[in-house]
């Protein structure tokens, strides 16, 4: 159907075309066009650059329409297939489903990490804007900000009771925050020579581990703030460190393409795991409840015998996720499907699924037993950098380079 422009719209369009021709050096075409369109004088200020702005706006709108169509298609598919309600599914089968419950804005830069508080109905987001924000994930309300770092906050972690929060930053520091009363920074620990990229509590809560671009991992005593151990072995920037639930070992991953398993007490590297073709961005320990599902998946890949674990999942810039039996240093199987870097992994509390966040802007839910993704959430407008699954309640949270934090309900 032919669109009819008003006289005023035609005049503005002609002026915008003339402005575009003139600003891009098409002098002959401009002269001919001005004569044909009967344009005299200079373009109004509001007309300058208008054609380019309109064009880029159309492209953005087309992109948004495509994303909305994908979401609509996903929703229609769920209706047709009769996605069961939460009441008809056991908690072990709840998975996040669109649309998001909340999309939270407030940070002025990319989100680097999102985590749930272990007991309160709170979640935290860390950002490149050097701020940690606290939100109520049930209401979507902003609670407060924790300020103290002077550069990007790279990672955050709670102790097992949620009384202390640890944070680390590109400002080379690790900070401990009182999460019971004051929300104040109670200790600042310095010792790394470069960006501190990851932090994790030992389960007992008396020590904190930090990983850095200086290629070392340090152990800090919570009571004194002193560094009591340094672990060396990686040959490049260490991206993440995560402690096993038993508190005896921990894992680290690096730009050097490797994953290392360490003894907490001895400083010894117990194993080096290699199979990824690029930087290993993230790692996650599998809960004991995942053992059956992982063994069934490994069995179908002809890995003979029952694997005892412990089991670890790793995500890489090579776009793959690998699941390892750390006890024998064996990669049991590979999950493929993401179209860009895998940024973070978290296991479903029921043990049946693994959830991943990626630079392809999606969150994927993986069925471990069948080694395939069963759900894709088109989560953000930009890279999806972080994801966390609540251990008791049906919620997933995600963070992105688009500066937003999203809350997803599971059913």
Swiss-Prot record:
GO BP term, pick one: establishment of mitotic spindle orientation
A single GO cellular-component term on record: cytoplasm
SUPFAM superfamilies: Lissencephaly-1 protein (Lis-1, PAF-AH alpha) N-terminal domain, WD40 repeat-like
Coiled-coil residue spans: 56-83
Cellular compartment(s): Cytoplasm, Cytoskeleton; Cytoplasm, Cytoskeleton, Microtubule organizing center, Centrosome
Gene Ontology molecular-function annotations: dynein complex binding; U4 snRNA binding; U6 snRNA binding
Keywords per UniProt: Cell cycle, Cell division, Coiled coil, Cytoplasm, Cytoskeleton, Microtubule, Mitosis, Repeat, Transport, WD repeat
Positions of WD repeats: 106-147, 149-187, 191-230, 233-272, 275-334, 337-376, 379-411
CDD domains found in the cross-reference section: WD40
Domain LisH: 9-41
Matching HAMAP family: lis1
PANTHER family: PRE-MRNA PROCESSING FACTOR 4, WD40 REPEAT PROTEIN
UniProt free text on domains: Dimerization mediated by the LisH domain may be required to activate dynein.
Family: Belongs to the WD repeat LIS1/nudF family.
Cited function: Positively regulates the activity of the minus-end directed microtubule motor protein dynein. May enhance dynein-mediated microtubule sliding by targeting dynein to the microtubule plus end. Required for several dynein- and microtubule-dependent processes.
Protein name, as recorded: Lissencephaly-1 homolog
């Amino acid at each position: 159907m032919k669109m009819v422009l008003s006289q005023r719209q035609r005049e503005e369009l002609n002026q915008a075309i003339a402005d575009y021709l003139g600003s891009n050096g098409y002098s002959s075409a401009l002269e001919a066009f001005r004569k044909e369109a009967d344009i005299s004088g200079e373009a109004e200020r509001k007309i300058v650059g208008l054609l380019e702005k309109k064009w880029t706006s159309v492209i953005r709108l087309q992109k948004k329409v495509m994303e909305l169509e994908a979401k609509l298609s996903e929703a229609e598919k769920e209706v047709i297939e009769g996605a069961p309600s939460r009441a008809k599914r056991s908690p072990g089968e709840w998975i996040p489903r669109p649309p998001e419950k909340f999309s939270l804005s407030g940070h002025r830069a990319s989100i680097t990490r999102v985590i749930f508080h272990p007991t309160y109905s709170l979640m935290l987001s860390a950002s490149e804007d050097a701020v940690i924000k606290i939100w109520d994930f049930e209401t979507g309300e902003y609670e407060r900000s924790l300020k103290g770092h002077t550069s990007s906050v790279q990672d955050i972690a709670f102790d097992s009771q949620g009384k202390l929060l640890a944070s680390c930053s590109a400002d080379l520091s690790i900070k401990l925050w009182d999460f019971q009363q004051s929300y104040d920074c109670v200790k600042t620990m310095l010792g790394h020579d470069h960006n501190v990229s990851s932090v994790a509590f030992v389960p007992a809560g008396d020590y904190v581990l930090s990983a850095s671009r200086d290629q070392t991992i340090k152990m800090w005593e919570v009571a004194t703030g002193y560094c009591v151990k340094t672990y060396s072995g990686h040959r490049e920037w260490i991206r993440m460190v995560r402690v096993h639930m038993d508190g005896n070992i921990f894992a680290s991953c690096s730009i050097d393409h490797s994953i290392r398993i360490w003894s907490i007490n001895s400083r010894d590297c117990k194993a080096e795991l290699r199979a990824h073709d690029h930087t290993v961005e993230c790692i996650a320990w599998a809960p004991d409840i995942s053992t059956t599902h992982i063994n069934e998946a490994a069995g179908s890949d002809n890995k003979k015998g029952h694997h005892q674990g412990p089991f670890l999942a790793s995500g890489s810039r090579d776009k793959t996720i690998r699941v390892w039996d750390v006890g024998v240093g064996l990669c049991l199987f590979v999950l493929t499907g993401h179209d860009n870097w895998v940024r973070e992994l978290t296991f479903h509390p029921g043990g049946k699924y693994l959830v991943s966040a990626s630079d392809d802007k999606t969150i994927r839910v993986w069925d471990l037993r069948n080694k395939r993704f069963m759900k894709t959430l088109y989560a953000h407008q930009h890279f999806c950098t972080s994801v966390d699954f609540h251990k008791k309640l049906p919620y997933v949270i995600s963070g992105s380079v688009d500066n937003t934090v999203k809350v997803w309900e599971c059913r």
